[in-house]
Amino acid sequence: MKPPSSIQTSEFDSSDEEPIEDEQTPIQISWLPLSRVNYSQFLGLCALPGCKFKDVRRNIQKDTEELKSCGIQDVFVFCTRGELSKYRVPNLLDLYHQYGIITHHHPIPDGGAPDIASCCEIMEELEICLQNNRKTLIHCYGGLGRSCLVAACLLLYLSDTVSPQQAIDSLRDLRGSGAIQTIKQYNYLHEFRDKLAAHLSSRESLSRSVSR
């Protein structure tokens, strides 16, 4: 009897008799609605495509083809180069390029948060993607910590009316209770607007002094 398609048998089969096959299930993309921040688009979040680690046996070619068939035009990757090697997808960024997907690589340490200058750069690039109506996806390793943090920051960046807790709740409703995983990420989100304002102010002051 064939198991239900929703069960990924490679995760449950402990037999050593057969080599572990790649998972056949399509990569799961969660779509965050941006209507509350006055954008009609959705932002995609997912786990690392092609990942081979412990019980996870994804196929990099199939996953990338799936993203392309979903119409993904831009992808933001928050894994470090070291992680891409560890999870056996060292050429993922090149593969995206081969498929014509614009790649934005902003490495953030696992469990961590970007410095405010890097985060501001990510926000500005994401906003340009949305303004140009480009179908955009973001991912880290599990699609829960760094990706959800960046998505929550985007909600705060695009709207003054969304509170940090509302942003967290939106991501946890979408990705589960594991979204925004560490105290560092939680605190970062609550301090985001103040740090962003200070960063933009200092950047503006520097720009004025240079132009004199």
Curated annotation (Swiss-Prot):
Catalyses: O-phospho-L-tyrosyl-[protein] + H2O = L-tyrosyl-[protein] + phosphate; O-phospho-L-seryl-[protein] + H2O = L-seryl-[protein] + phosphate; O-phospho-L-threonyl-[protein] + H2O = L-threonyl-[protein] + phosphate
Organism of derivation: Sus scrofa (Pig)
Q: What is its EC number?
A: 3.1.3.16, 3.1.3.48
Its taxonomic path starts at: Eukaryota, Metazoa, Chordata, Craniata, Vertebrata
- Which InterPro entries is this protein grouped with? CDK_inhib_3, CDKN3, Prot-tyrosine_phosphatase-like, PTP, Tyr_Pase_cat, Tyr_Pase_dom, TYR_PHOSPHATASE_DUAL_dom
User: Where this protein primarily resides, as one coarse class?
Assistant: cytoplasm
What is its biological role? May play a role in cell cycle regulation. Dual specificity phosphatase active toward substrates containing either phosphotyrosine or phosphoserine residues. Dephosphorylates CDK2 at 'Thr-160' in a cyclin-dependent manner.
Which keywords does this Swiss-Prot/TrEMBL entry list?
A: Cell cycle, Cytoplasm, Hydrolase, Protein phosphatase
**Bias-annotated ranges (Acidic residues):** 13-23
Quaternary form?
Answer: Interacts with cyclin-dependent kinases such as CDK1, CDK2 and CDK3. Does not interact with CDK4. Interacts (via C-terminus) with phosphorylated CDK2 (via C-terminal helix). Interacts with MS4A3 (via C-terminus); the interaction enhances CDKN3 enzymatic activity.
Query: Could you name the Gene Ontology cellular component terms for this entry?
Result: cytoplasm; nucleus; perinuclear region of cytoplasm
Q: Where is the Tyrosine-protein phosphatase domain?
A: 32-201
UniProt xrefs under PANTHER family: TYROSINE SPECIFIC PROTEIN PHOSPHATASE AND DUAL SPECIFICITY PROTEIN PHOSPHATASE (PTHR23339)
Q: Which CDD domains match?
A: CDKN3-like
User: Into which family does the record put it?
Assistant: Belongs to the protein-tyrosine phosphatase family.
Catalytic class of the enzyme: hydrolase
Q: What is this protein called?
A: Cyclin-dependent kinase inhibitor 3
Protein localization: Cytoplasm, Perinuclear region
